[in-house]
Amino acid sequence: MRPLGKGLLPAEELIRSNLGVGRSLRDCLSQSGKLAEELGSKRLKPAKFGTEGKERVEQRTERQRTGSSKEPRMQIICRRRWREPPPRLLWGCLMPRAQPLLHVTAYENTGHWERLASVVSSKTQQPTVISHSSISITFSHYPPATLDSFLVLEPIKLFPVSSLRSPLCLNCGSCRESIRISGELIGNAHSPAPPRTPELETLGWDKQAVLSGAQVILVCAEV
């Protein structure tokens, strides 16, 4: 057996010097395991299987989404809108026996129709409705499609059918329902004008206003 060089120790003495005098390899391994547990407890442990691990993962995911686990999560729901049918004209859905009443009667409750009649001259082909505080519009024999339907007036304004004080009559021959509109109705009175009876065709706009008490024909459609 060759002698070792200067400064070199045999393997047995090297192990003993590292383990300590009187300590075995088994003791060193057990101590290393305890030291590993102490160091591992200070680190973030991975999520375990079970309830505790699942809750920890959900809280961390919630914190990543909202910044805090206590804040409510905003949920965005996207619904696909199907192709909507085109709006149907009001006078197109009236009953045949209501043809003489195709026009829409508009009158003001505050008694200022003289102001409207004054701006309607014999040369005016398309009269305009000036601002009013309250206007009531009467629809004759108007069957709505659904309770969520809207009426579009010219100028475009939306009035829900469900705001009617009384339900519309669907099959009554002499039913006349009206809705009360609070607000302003400014713009062109007709564009284009609905079909008119021969009696109304022979009268001018100014004579219609005087004869029928400022009766104005409006374009209405349902959407």
Swiss-Prot record:
Residues 40-70 are annotated as: Disordered. InterPro entries: DUF5553. This is Uncharacterized protein LINC03042. It comes from the Eukaryota. Residues 51-70 have a biased composition (Basic and acidic residues). The lineage of its organism: Eukaryota, Metazoa, Chordata, Craniata, Vertebrata.
